[in-house]
């Protein structure tokens, strides 16, 4: 469960990190991105471990709130799933169609940007 939660927070951070304050951004970057402990972050910023914990939990709720309203991460996952399904279908049904393969590659490149 923790690994899935970490992956989700990293993804939400990628989508919504620019909307956070500098302190929120820094704490989450260190905690999830650089795998710092609460104690290490507290020492770095000369605050209590509890202050770091509270800030991180509050920021996680903020990120989840952004996702609940904007659905950017959910839409991204759905687009990727649809693109994967389309790619499998085209490869199975039209393996020799080079033009279709190129169009699909162009579409996949757009979804990755």
UniProtKB/Swiss-Prot annotation:
Instruction: List the InterPro entries hit by this protein, alphabetically.
Output: RNA_pol_sigma_r3/r4-like (IPR013324), UPF0122 (IPR007394), UPF0122_fam_protein (IPR054831), WH-like_DNA-bd_sf (IPR036388)
Question: Which NCBIfam families does the protein's record reference?
Answer: PRK00118.1-4, PRK00118.1-6, YlxM
Function as written in the Swiss-Prot or TrEMBL entry: Might take part in the signal recognition particle (SRP) pathway. This is inferred from the conservation of its genetic proximity to ftsY/ffh. May be a regulatory protein.
Protein name per UniProt:
UPF0122 protein LCA_0713
The family classification in the record reads: Belongs to the UPF0122 family.
The protein's matches in HAMAP family, at most eight in alphabetical order, are given as: UPF0122 (MF_00245)
Q: Which SUPFAM superfamilies match?
A: Sigma3 and sigma4 domains of RNA polymerase sigma factors
């Amino acid at each position: 469960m923790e690994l899935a939660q970490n992956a989700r927070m990293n993804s939400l951070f990628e989508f919504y990190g620019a909307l956070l304050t500098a302190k929120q951004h820094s704490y989450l970057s260190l905690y999830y991105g650089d795998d710092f402990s609460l104690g290490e972050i507290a020492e770095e910023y000369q605050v209590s471990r509890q202050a770091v914990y509270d800030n991180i939990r509050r920021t996680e709720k903020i990120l989840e709130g952004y996702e609940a309203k904007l659905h950017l991460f959910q839409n991204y996952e759905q687009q990727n799933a649809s693109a994967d399904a389309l790619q499998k279908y085209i490869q199975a049904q039209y393996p020799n169609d080079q033009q279709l393969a190129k169009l699909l590659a162009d579409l996949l490149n757009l979804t990755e940007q």
